[in-house]
Regions:
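Catalytic adenosine-cofactor/nucleotide-binding cores of aminoacyl-tRNA synthetases and other
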Residues: 59, 64, 167-168, 178-257
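Short secondary-structure transition/capping segments
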Residues: 40-55, 79-84, 105, 111, ...
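Bulky hydrophobic/aromatic packing residues
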Residues: 1, 7, 24, 31, ...
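Generic preference for well-ordered secondary structure
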Residues: 4, 29, 36, 52-55, ...
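N-terminal Rossmann-like or analogous alpha/beta NTP/dinucleotide-binding catalytic cores
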Residues: 1-77, 163-181
Length: 257
């Protein structure tokens, strides 16, 4: 299945989703279900947000990133990334901030909850959950909220993703608990890196499919190179979808052990 995570429309480039789907098709990857587009599913996220609100688990926050950094770096600042500046505002303070015309973000009242979860690569994990944002000041729903709603709605049982998201998992587990959602199993794998050992990123002009095409590298060879990069075949080997699925399942079992 394919999910287009495009909630922050201010940062999404027009045509980027279509280009990604085209690139996947060119290297022979197909999907069995209709493509899920998060920007078309905001009603589901709004329902989840209202459930949190009904449990008094949300509060308005007007803090800027600069203010949060300054408060957290103070001698007696909070140990977590958000210092709680807006958590217990009085009625008068709330009225003053609302009158300013600035739109607030919405944060959860996590109360420093300790969350434990198991990762099949990294083992047992324990994290303190911060009061993280679930709705941004621009009105966009945050990734943490959308992803747990979508995972549950799509009956996702296993999440396999880059280990840059390992630290985000506790917040998602906390949301799953509050919303009564099923927790999937997690596998966080090392990120794909370039020949300079830097994380592959469009921001850093990493290798693209179009760039490979200009170098006369076929889509089939790009597919083979990608599969070889995670140790599922030799670079010169061409494997079909059935072989790929079988070997991918095997490497997850090896990662777990």
């Amino acid at each position: 299945m394919i999910r287009i995570e495009d909630l922050d429309l201010e940062r999404c480039r027009a045509g980027s989703a279509e280009q990604q789907l085209s690139d996947l098709a060119k290297i022979g990857l197909e999907w069995d279900q209709p493509v899920i587009v998060q920007s078309e599913r905001t009603a589901l996220y709004a329902l989840a947000l209202e459930r949190l609100r009904s449990e008094d688990l949300l509060y308005e926050c007007w803090c800027t990133r600069a203010e949060i950094r300054e408060a957290s770096s103070a001698p007696h600042g909070a140990p977590t990334s958000y210092p709680g500046s807006c958590r217990e505002l009085s009625s008068a303070q709330l009225a003053q901030r609302r009158a300013s015309g600035r739109r607030p973000a919405l944060r959860v009242r996590a109360e420093g909850a300790e969350i434990e979860f198991f990762d099949r690569v990294h083992g047992e994990q324990k994290r303190t959950v911060d009061d993280f944002v679930v709705a941004r000041q621009n009105g966009a729903f945050a990734y943490h909220l959308a992803v747990v709603v979508d995972d549950n709605d799509q009956s996702i049982e296993e999440v396999v993703r880059g280990d840059d998201l390992l630290d985000s998992t506790a917040a998602q587990c906390w949301l799953q608990e509050q919303l009564g959602l099923v927790r999937p199993s997690y596998v966080h794998l090392p990120l794909l890196r370039d020949d300079q050992a830097l994380r592959m990123s469009k921001r850093d002009s990493s290798v693209t499919l179009d760039g490979q095409r200009q170098l006369a590298v076929s889509a089939a060879q790009v597919r083979s190179n990608l599969i070889a990069s995670i140790g599922l075949c030799d670079a010169a080997e061409m494997i079909n979808d059935e072989q790929l699925l079988s070997r991918f399942s095997s490497i997850l079992v090896e990662s777990a052990s």
